[in-house]
Amino acid sequence: MKFTTLATLALGAVSALAAPVTELESRQLFCRDVYVFFARGTGEVGTLGTVVGPGLSAAVKLAVRDSVEFEGIDYPALVSGYLAGGDRGGARTMANKVSQTASRCPNAKIFISGYSQGAQVTHLAARQLSAADQARVTGVVTFGDPYRDDALPGGLQSRRKTYCNVGDLICAGLPTLLAPHFTYGSDTPDAARWIAARV
C-alpha cells in the first residue's frame, strides 16, 4: 500500500514538472533551420537529377552550418512538360511544400530552386504562392532557366539568383540543347554560398 502511494505521488510529481506540449510546439519540434525545394531538369532520373541537384545538395549542406533539408520535387520531367512551359503538377507540389513548411516551421528559411524545366516549375510555383508565403521564401535559385527574362512575383525578384551560361539556348527560350546547358554543376558551390549568406 505504501509502495503504491509513493509510486503514485512520484508519477504525479513528474507529470506536474513536465510542461504540456502544445500542438504548435509539437509540429515545430522536427523543423530544420533551412529548407531547399529543388526541381530537376527534363529527362533526369530520381527527384534530384544528375546535373545540378546532387552537387547543390552537397554544397548547401557544407556551406550552411545549420540543419538543412534538401528535397527534390517528385514530378514527371517529361519533354511535353517543358514544351508546355513547365509541369503544372510539379509546380503545385513545390508550392504546397512551401506553404506547408511555412505554416509548420515559422522560423525556417525556405529556398526554391530548379534546373532547366525545373526552373520553369520554380517560376510557376512562385506564382501560385500567396503573398504571405512568397514573403516566407528567402531566395530563389535557377539554372539554365527558360524563364530567365521573366520577373518573379512580389518581392521574390529581388531575392533571385539565376545562372545562365553563354551559349545555352535554353536560357534564350529556344528548345535547343547544347553543351553549355549541361555544365551548371560547376556553379553549385557559388549558389550554395549565395544561399548560406542569406541564412
From Swiss-Prot:
Its EC number is 3.1.1.74. The active site is at residues 116, 168, 181. It comes from the Eukaryota. InterPro entries: AB_hydrolase_fold, Cutinase/axe, Cutinase_monf. The keyword Lipid metabolism does not apply. Belongs to the cutinase family. Residues 1-18 form the signal peptide. This is Cutinase CUT1. One of its GO terms (cellular component) is extracellular region. Pfam families: Cutinase (PF01083). Disulfide bonds join 31-105, 164-171. Catalyzes the hydrolysis of complex carboxylic polyesters found in the cell wall of plants. Degrades cutin, a macromolecule that forms the structure of the plant cuticle. Also degrades suberin, a specialized macromolecule found in the cell wall of various plant tissues. Optimum pH is 7-8. The keyword Ribonucleoprotein does not apply. Residues 19-27 form a propeptide. It comes from Coprinopsis cinerea. The 2 disulfide bonds play a critical role in holding the catalytic residues in juxta-position; reduction of the disulfide bridges results in the complete inactivation of the enzyme. It catalyses: cutin + H2O = cutin monomers. The gene is CUT1. GO terms for biological process: carbohydrate catabolic process. The record marks 117 as: Transition state stabilizer. Keywords: Disulfide bond, Hydrolase, Pyrrolidone carboxylic acid, Signal. GO terms for molecular function: cutinase activity.
